[in-house]
């Protein structure tokens, strides 16, 4: 994961939300914009739960990102957790990520 920077400011997140393509799953939403460098952000709102649940949701999403890092095209990503994420098995979440990854690769940029 060398060379990956995190999105830090509201402006950076808003840029990805407005200009990016949203890929929805029952457990998370992935916003993506092709770019020349790899930047990543993780979001879990209070709808997901209290701080402990939100942090766990972000850890699960980070684990997904690390697992698929080599297969992801370079760009800016924002993973947004949904409340169902915490009740789901990691295997099921992994399957959803595989589907989204295929959709990203099929799309013509």
From Swiss-Prot:
Its EC number is 3.1.26.5. One of its GO terms (cellular component) is ribonuclease P complex. One of its GO terms (molecular function) is ribonuclease P activity. Keywords: Endonuclease, Hydrolase, Nuclease, RNA-binding, tRNA processing. It is an enzyme of class 3 (hydrolase). InterPro entries: Ribosomal_Su5_D2-typ_SF, Ribsml_uS5_D2-typ_fold_subgr, RNase_P, RNase_P_CS. GO terms for biological process: tRNA 5'-leader removal. It comes from the Bacteria. Transmembrane segments: none annotated. Consists of a catalytic RNA component (M1 or rnpB) and a protein subunit. RNaseP catalyzes the removal of the 5'-leader sequence from pre-tRNA to produce the mature 5'-terminus. It can also cleave other RNA substrates such as 4.5S RNA. The protein component plays an auxiliary but essential role in vivo by binding to the 5'-leader sequence and broadening the substrate specificity of the ribozyme. This is Ribonuclease P protein component. It comes from Nitratiruptor sp. (strain SB155-2). The lineage of its organism: Bacteria, Pseudomonadati, Campylobacterota, Epsilonproteobacteria, Nautiliales.
């Amino acid at each position: 994961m060398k060379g990956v920077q995190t999105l830090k400011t509201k402006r950076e997140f808003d840029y990805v939300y407005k200009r990016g393509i949203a890929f929805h799953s029952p457990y998370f939403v992935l916003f993506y914009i092709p770019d020349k460098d790899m930047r990543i952000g993780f979001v879990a709102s209070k709808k997901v739960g209290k701080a402990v649940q939100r942090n766990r949701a972000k850890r699960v999403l980070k684990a997904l990102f690390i697992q698929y890092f080599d297969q992801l095209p370079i760009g800016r990503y924002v993973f947004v957790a949904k409340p169902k994420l915490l009740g789901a098995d990691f295997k099921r979440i992994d399957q959803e990520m595989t589907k989204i990854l295929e959709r990203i690769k099929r799309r013509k940029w």
